[in-house]
Amino acid sequence: RGELMHKFGMLFQGGALFDSLPVWENVAFGPIQSDGVNRAKARQIALGKLAAVGLGPEVATLRPSELSGGMQKRVSLARAIAREPEIIFFDEPTTGLDPIMADVINDLIVKSVKGLGATAVSITHDMASARKIADRIAMLYGGKIIWQGPAKDVDRSGNEFVDQFIHGRAEGPIRMELRKL
């Protein structure tokens, strides 16, 4: 099981950082808990991964609650790549971020995935993010994949569901039920 888990990294939508631990221990959680890495080596791994996401060593001793949302997201990314996984799952990686920080996170995701030679699977409603980080896009509706193809083709998918979604139109085949008061 440990060998299998070593192959996966995860960036959770809400960050899922432990407020009781300093940033470096959050980043090094996997190496310490699952790989048995000693604390000194784990701290070095954490500092390296923090640097990879644009955070300096001064952040390492802070608690997650002392960080901005964008910094927390970068710490979460550092944790996701700390074990150098083969596959990284991203759950709404840009949710709650302003457009500039979202673009920074997207750039860091692309850089991290390429640097590791990893496969990335992202779940997102943010089409700017999907276009930037994806090679391929699949759209789910009603529990089924209704379109899939290269990211560059999503704007001309020919699929009315995809077209409605990417353009954010209320009219179309996707119906949003509104409760009446």
How would you label these PLM feature ranges?
Residues 21-29:
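Short coil-to-helix segment of the ABC ATPase nucleotide-binding domain corresponding to the Q-loop/switch region
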Residues 88-91:
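Catalytic Walker B motif of ABC-type/P-loop ATPase nucleotide-binding domains
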Residues 40-58:
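Conserved ABC ATPase "signature" region
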